[in-house]
Amino acid sequence: MLGSLVLRRKALAPRLLLRLLRSPTLRGHGGASGRNVTTGSLGEPQWLRVATGGRPGTSPALFSGRGAATGGRQGGRFDTKCLAAATWGRLPGPEETLPGQDSWNGVPSRAGLGMCALAAALVVHCYSKSPSNKDAALLEAARANNMQEVSRLLSEGADVNAKHRLGWTALMVAAINRNNSVVQVLLAAGADPNLGDDFSSVYKTAKEQGIHSLEDGGQDGASRHITNQWTSALEFRRWLGLPAGVLITREDDFNNRLNNRASFKGCTALHYAVLADDYRTVKELLDGGANPLQRNEMGHTPLDYAREGEVMKLLRTSEAKYQEKQRKREAEERRRFPLEQRLKEHIIGQESAIATVGAAIRRKENGWYDEEHPLVFLFLGSSGIGKTELAKQTAKYMHKDAKKGFIRLDMSEFQERHEVAKFIGSPPGYVGHEEGGQLTKKLKQCPNAVVLFDEVDKAHPDVLTIMLQLFDEGRLTDGKGKTIDCKDAIFIMTSNVASDEIAQHALQLRQEALEMSRNRIAENLGDVQISDKITISKNFKENVIRPILKAHFRRDEFLGRINEIVYFLPFCHSELIQLVNKELNFWAKRAKQRHNITLLWDREVADVLVDGYNVHYGARSIKHEVERRVVNQLAAAYEQDLLPGGCTLRITVEDSDKQLLKSPELPSPQAEKRLPKLRLEIIDKDSKTRRLDIRAPLHPEKVCNTI
């Protein structure tokens, strides 16, 4: 078994052991005493014997009955010390003695050289059985173009997508070294050709991982001295898989022809195959599913690195085919799962707003839009009603969670005229000229981003002047005079202007619809749904909203560049029930995670909490109502030690107050004290319930301060 293990390592272990045993530096390293502390008279390295568990001058503990883990009662600590010294390249000195022994005289062992080599091979054998070492061996075999070794390691369970500790995979190693046969084996085994490299540059990677960029990391003074005198120490450490310098590791384990100062983060195997200018490997990767449009951290595709020739022609053809397949795949996905349906999963209500935004984006995705002008939206409505969330979900749909695809600017930070410089950058000669503007800098990175100008009504009117060119021609000139083309971007502005008028008009429309349904004497679910669907009239938009917007923004040309003005309406009763249940589910999940408490509630609880809705504050008023009437009780009960771990709680409405919920009329101010109250009940294991007696603290609104 040991022989086969060594042969599998290409006879590296025997050669290395011979170099260790025959090294003149080792035989001469004895200090002032002149004694050969490293080897005995038979050439036996005592430090290697101790590393395997034995004491100097004796048989190894592997065969003596004393375990290598303990090392005996006398030699345990020293054996561990020498084991660390052996693996880290530092040899024990003559001044280091065993407990209970005057000195280490280097008496040779009876076992001799063969026994020592056998023990060292056992150490290597134990190390090679770890799963991580199979992955490391796979990387080595891929670099050496050893197709048989790669196949064997994969059959033994090596991870085909395992990464080197510095970030690359075996497929990347094979691609950069033009090992086409290994690339075929790895792709057949399921290697992902679209994985990105985590290695950036030598110096940046060294800083991130805390390793020296040039020297061997983790050495102390003694081991560095040994490395300078005996070059095999570094080889021995690298053979055992111990940390080495980033530059040495990159050149030895990956490739030594790459620029060490360039950043390779995000590069795929296809990027590396193009850098190697290997036509066969590029074709294999493309046939194996590699994405020719994938960009690295620098924003470059494989085509950007291609030279003139067959590889460039192949990449251009593949890009066109891949784009066509991608368009068909995305179109099929949109048919099966429309944008409106995706948005409704995250936003409650606002069907009219979702339909308006979805229709505009559908025109853009299918090519039915003006390519010379960007899409511009203005979201109007009360606070806490879903305007910002709709913008976020639109960006998530367009850019698949890419952070650069969503740019948010809080326009309350641009209330002064001079703050235009923060928008596009300072002019030459002013502070911050080299840094660039907040908007222009981000649009350079992603010209087709979704840009949110939050609360645009709070910005200075002169700040909005620069948006005229942005919305009309889809370009913007920064403080350095450079033009950023962003015709493919989507610009969304949110505003609370005319929010009161919109809310009152919507409530009036709902009241009229409710009266119509009552006149029909048909209060069923269908009529409720009909009453929920209201539409803002054109007369209201032109005669009420338009004058308010013109008075605030002062420019017709600014309003004329807006493609769609989207109106967000107050929530109806059914939508408020959804908001309450969503908030209660949030606190039920939090109670389970933090306190192992199961939280339940009756259906009437949602009807009670809906009364806390304020049309001016939107969903935030529901959130605050749940915190006041439910979470406050939970916190007080927990503080008073009334909630045992693992219990089940139920939120109920007092029986004497449930009849108030059946009354269709709103309670008068005199009857405010008779509003339903929420109580907490604990459910025992026998399904019996008991009400919690919570000592209510002073209510903040009922505390009187005496002067």
Curated annotation (Swiss-Prot):
Modified residues (N6-acetyllysine): K589
Keyword Disulfide bond: no
GO annotation, cellular component aspect: cytoplasm; mitochondrial intermembrane space; mitochondrion
Effect after changing R628C: In MGCA7B; uncertain significance
Entry EC no(s): 3.6.1.-
Protein name: Mitochondrial disaggregase
Tissue: Widely expressed (at protein level). Expressed in fetal, as well as in adult tissues, with highest levels in adult brain, including thalamus, hippocampus, occipital cortex and parietal cortex. Low expression in granulocytes.
Stretch forming the transit peptide: 1-36
Binding site for ATP: H346, I348, S383, G384, I385, G386, K387, T388, E455, N496, R561, R620
Consequence of changing K404T: In MGCA7A; decreased ATP hydrolysis activity; decreased ATP-dependent protein disaggregase activity
Span list, region Regulatory: 507-535
Matching SMART domains: AAA, ANK, ClpB_D2-small
Superkingdom per UniProt: Eukaryota
Reaction(s) catalysed by this chain's protein: ATP + H2O = ADP + phosphate + H(+)
Top EC group: hydrolase
Subcellular location: Mitochondrion intermembrane space
Site (Cleavage): C126, Y127
UniProt gene name: CLPB
Activity regulation information from UniProt: Disaggregase activity is inhibited by ADP.
Organism: Homo sapiens (Human)
Ranges for region Autoinhibitory: 92-126
